Amino acid sequence: MLFDKQRWQEFAAGYSIFDCTIFDKHRFVCLSYEITDSPHRDPLPRMRLLLVRASRPLDAKRFVLNEYGNFGFARVSSNLTPMEFAAVDTSGHVFSYDAARAEEEPEHPRDLASSDLAGVVNQVVRIGQSIYTVGGPRRLHKRLGVGQWQDLSKNVPWPKDVATPGNGLKYMWRDASGFSESDIYVAGGEGDVMRFDGQKFSKVAFPSNELLHNVHCAGDGRVYIGGNMGSLYVGRENTWKKLAGGDFSVPWKDIAWFAGKLWCGSDYGLWTLEGDKLVRAQVPADVQLTSGVIDISPDGKHMLTAGPDGASLFDGKNWQVLFSRHDFE
């Protein structure tokens, strides 16, 4: 058991998981928010970043908790070289943790060259051996170190209508994934997909202008893109095919390739792609209740998934429910 009742009350009770990241089967991070009754997030609910070291004894040494009250919606990712995790919210607040430090950093860059607009961070991802942030309008940054972010989108094609009122979502990138750090796909906005070769961006001829939420460069050599209300596309460069219509009430939170198949996670659990058809994942019921966001360990051996009420771990053969709110509340 990852928690006992005492540690649950101390570290997790009253909080809902929003994102997660995994180093290996023994070390992972859950980003969660305080459960409140405020319909307008005013004041902001408190954010917790809980580092779990599952191989340690069930005492305070198993958990490292950091808590903040000034973060909006944040996402988190991790890296092994150096071993660290970083969380960034939509307004550019940054928290990072490594062996020597755990603290809030200077804000993530938000200024847009030759513009009065401010950038927004929507996602934090690991590509290759680096952490990247994705946002809008058309923003991609690579983490170089504490307080250091390389703006890769300086030379991205800049639409003439980006500042037109009502176009706030049109170029709002929401996700990025790469076969390598010189073959990255970025997606979001209204069918706004680009490929980055490590030096420059090129526009991808995508067949839809629907709002896009996810992109994943998969182990089968293809790129999968998740659209509005759970639609799914597959392709690469300028050739694409729609696999599934947007028949769900919510978009995917994450899509990922693991154990030879594509996994899609949402507020309602996990789906897998079988052939060219999306089906409800054949996993235990308690796993479905503790799934949604997805992260794959850097060595590719474990998949961590988490939902508001808990988290589960998969090694390609066996599932382990790490914890569930239903066991304690």
In which residue ranges do the predicted regions lie?
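Residue-level hotspots at or immediately adjacent to binding/recognition sites across diverse folds
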Residues: 1-329
